[in-house]
C-alpha cells in the first residue's frame, strides 16, 4: 500500500514543480522581456518603426538604441528606445520635432513627466494606434531626446499613457 502511494506521489510532485517553474518563467518574461542593444535603426526596420525615428540620427554624437522583446502566453510585444544626447544640437532637435509633428499631433496634447523627462504620445497617421504607438521624451536637464516605439498586434487599448510608458519602457529609459 505504501509503495503505491509513493509511486503516485512522485509523479504528481514532479508535475507540480514543472508547472510552477513554467509559470515563474512566463511571469518573468512578461515583466522583463529580453533586452538587446541595437546598433542602427536598420536592425529594427522589420518592425515598421523606421518612419517614427529621425532619419538623420547618424548626424548626432551620442545615439543609443535598445530593443525589448516581451513574450506573453501566445503573443509578443516589442519596444524600441532611441536615446539621442547631443547638447550642441539639442535645440535644433527640438525644433525638428515641432516641424515634423507640430503642436497638435499628440494624443490629447497632454504631456506627462517621468524620470525628469517630459513625454508625449505621437498620433502620426502611419502608426496604427493602439497596436503601434510612439512617444517622444525631452529632458532639458540632460539635453537628451528619447524616441520610444511600441508594437503589439494583440493590444486593444492602452489606458493611462504614463503608466504605459512605465510598464513598457522603465528598463530602457
Q: Predicted regions span which residues?
A:
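Short, flexible coil/linker segments at or flanking structured domains
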Residues: 16-17, 22, 68-70, 124-126
Amino acid at each position: 500500500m505504501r509503495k503505491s502511494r509513493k509511486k503516485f506521489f512522485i509523479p504528481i510532485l514532479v508535475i507540480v514543480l514543472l508547472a510552477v517553474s513554467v509559470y515563474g518563467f512566463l511571469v518573468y518574461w512578461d515583466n522583463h522581456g529580453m533586452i538587446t542593444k541595437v546598433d542602427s535603426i536598420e536592425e529594427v526596420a522589420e518592425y515598421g518603426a523606421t518612419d517614427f525615428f529621425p532619419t538623420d540620427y547618424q548626424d548626432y554624437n551620442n545615439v543609443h538604441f535598445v530593443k525589448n522583446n516581451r513574450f506573453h502566453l501566445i503573443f509578443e510585444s516589442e519596444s524600441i528606445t532611441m536615446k539621442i544626447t547631443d547638447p550642441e544640437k539639442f535645440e535644433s532637435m527640438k525644433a525638428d520635432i515641432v516641424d515634423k509633428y507640430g503642436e497638435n499631433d499628440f494624443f490629447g496634447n497632454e504631456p506627462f513627466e517621468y524620470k525628469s523627462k517630459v513625454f508625449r504620445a505621437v498620433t502620426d497617421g502611419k502608426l496604427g494606434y493602439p497596436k503601434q504607438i510612439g512617444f517622444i521624451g525631452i529632458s532639458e536637464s540632460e539635453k537628451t531626446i528619447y524616441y520610444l516605439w511600441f508594437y503589439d498586434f494583440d493590444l486593444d487599448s492602452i489606458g493611462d499613457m504614463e503608466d504605459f510608458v512605465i510598464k513598457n519602457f522603465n528598463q530602457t529609459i
